Amino acid sequence: MNKNNENNIKLTFHPAEFGEKMPIPLAEQSVKAGFPSPAQDYMEGEIDLNDILVRHREATFYVRISGDSMKDAGIFDGDLAVVDRQIEPSNGNFVIAFVDGEFTIKQFKMDESGTFGWLIPWNSDFSPIRVDETNRFMVWGVVTYVIHRIAE
């Protein structure tokens, strides 16, 4: 079954806020999967996630993802995407795009001819969306990070 129309996709946009810093302890060493260690013994300082996630303050937004067209890329319903509107989209970037009155998150691929592009879903239940001069289309921003909750 191919879902060509993604009217069920709903994105919620939030500007990146930079009020009071919220430093979080930073472990001195990287953590190997499966190797337990008393982490508190290895704290080296603090970090603020905005310093890592946000390169262009005025152009960065957080977008809540709704829908499952990108699940095979590890982007799930309810995830939070960090989107930078100042980055020029490149072939292969994951983007928030505006197509014919709808926002969507997809991988952007330009055709070799350069005359049209594709918005590629990462779920075989969905079809790629061809974009060219006949569409109302714009890349709204480039997805730089995705925050995915793994525990409640």
Descriptions of predicted regions:
Residues M1-K71, E102-F103, F137-W140, Y145-E152:
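Short, positionally conserved secondary-structure boundary motifs
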Residues V54, Q86-E88, M110:
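Short polar/acidic secondary-structure junctions
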Residues Y62-S66, I96-F98, F108, W118-W122:
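Short, acidic/hydrophobic/Gly-rich beta-strand patch recurrent on exposed beta strands
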Residues G78-D79, N93:
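Structural motif
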Residues V82-V83, I96:
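Hydrophobic beta-strand signal
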Residues N91-T115:
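Short, compositionally biased
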Residues M110-E152:
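Glycine- and charge-enriched low-complexity intrinsically disordered segments
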